[in-house]
Amino acid sequence: MKVGVVGLQGDVSEHIEATKMAIEKLELPGEVIWLKRPEQLKGVDAVIIPGGESTTISRLMQRTGLFEPIKKMVEDGLPVMGTCAGLIMLAKEVLGATPEQKFLEVLDVKVNRNAYGRQVDSFEAPVKLAFDDEPFIGVFIRAPRIVELLSEKVKPLAWLEDRVVGVEQENIIGLEFHPELTNDTRIHEYFLRKVI
C-alpha cells in the first residue's frame, strides 16, 4: 500500500505520522510519501489532502501539476481524504470563495470557508463517529463548515452534537476537523480500509 500526502502546504508531517501509525496498527505493508510532483502519483493507492490554507493549496496544486491528475484519479475511484482545507478542496460548492479559486469539485457538499472564525476561535470537542461508539476528539482550527449535503451519495461520517462535521461519498472522505492532530488513528485506519 502506498499513500501520498499532498505536501505543498499545511500539516503534512502530522498526516504522514498518523498514516504510518494506522498502517502499523492494521499490520499492513505500506509506505507514506510526501507528494509534491505529479510523477510521484504513479503507484499511489490513496491520497490525503491536509489542512492549511485552501487558496494556497489550490494555487500550488495547479502550479506543480498535481491538480488535474488527482482530480481524474479521484473521479476514477482513488480513495482520498481531505481535512479542513482539504475538505474545501474536495467540495462541489464553496461559499466565500473568490472567482479565481479552483477546487477539485468531487465531493457533493456545500461548505462555508472559515465558518468558525479566526484561529483564536479554534477549539477541541468530542465528535461522534458513524463507525465507532467511542467519541473522537475533533480539533477544529479555522474550520470550514459543511452546510449542505448535495446528493444521496453523501453519507454522514461524523457529528458534533447534531451537526454533520464529516462525510463519506464512495471513495471520498471529507472532514471539517484535524484527525492527525490527536494520537487517535481510528479515522486514518477507517480511510486505509478503503484501499485494502
From Swiss-Prot:
Pathway this chain belongs to: Cofactor biosynthesis; pyridoxal 5'-phosphate biosynthesis
GO CC list: cytosol; glutaminase complex
UniProt entry tagged with the keyword Lyase: yes
Catalytic activity: aldehydo-D-ribose 5-phosphate + D-glyceraldehyde 3-phosphate + L-glutamine = pyridoxal 5'-phosphate + L-glutamate + phosphate + 3 H2O + H(+); L-glutamine + H2O = L-glutamate + NH4(+)
E.C. no: 4.3.3.6, 3.5.1.2
Active-site residues annotated for this sequence: C84, H178, E180
SUPFAM superfamilies per record: Class I glutamine amidotransferase-like
Keyword Translocase: no
Segments forming a coiled coil: none
HAMAP family, per database record: PdxT
Subunit structure comment from the entry: In the presence of PdxS, forms a dodecamer of heterodimers. Only shows activity in the heterodimer.
The name this protein goes by in its record: Pyridoxal 5'-phosphate synthase subunit PdxT
Source organism: Pyrococcus horikoshii (strain ATCC 700860 / DSM 12428 / JCM 9974 / NBRC 100139 / OT-3)
